[in-house]
Regions:
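Long, contiguous binding/interaction regions
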Residues: 2-141
Length: 141
């Protein structure tokens, strides 16, 4: 339910941006549900970041979301999720029905770097019985 509300909120924000062309209304951009985990989805998010005024040559905060049914699975994935600039933390998901492994860090949002993390984290989520739910980035100008 929370994911649906979050996606609806994202769509509303994108429409507001398109209508007003004001980048001040959006400070985070994330993938749409159908494109999560794909190279095309990563390209769409990077294009949205650029359209929102982000300087893609500057490091920004990125968050990758992995969900698990139980804490041991989330902890196991978190032990392998951190790589390079990324650090993993585990907490209850917002809807309290699952566990979130949040993988976060500062990096330059390049297509190659992001997609390599996406592929790795998607495989990690599947290997531990979880679900990869995409990434978001803060708009840094």
């Amino acid at each position: 339910m929370i994911r649906i509300i979050a996606l609806l909120a994202l769509l509303i924000l994108i429409v507001a941006l398109a209508r007003s062309r004001s980048v001040a209304q959006i400070n985070r951009i994330e993938a749409t549900k159908g494109s999560i985990g794909s190279l095309e989805g990563d390209r769409q998010v990077l294009a949205q970041l650029s359209e929102a005024g982000a300087d893609l040559s500057k490091p920004t905060e990125l968050n990758f979301y992995l969900y698990f049914k139980d804490r041991p699975s989330a902890d196991s994935a978190a032990a392998h999720a951190g790589a390079g600039p990324l650090v993993a933390t585990v907490r209850r998901a917002g809807d309290d029905s699952s566990w979130l492994c949040l993988v976060s860090g500062q990096m330059v949002p390049s297509e190659a770097a992001i997609h390599s993390h996406v592929v790795r984290l998607l495989a990690l989520a599947v290997a531990h019985g979880g679900e990869y739910d995409g990434w978001e980035a803060k708009v840094v100008k």
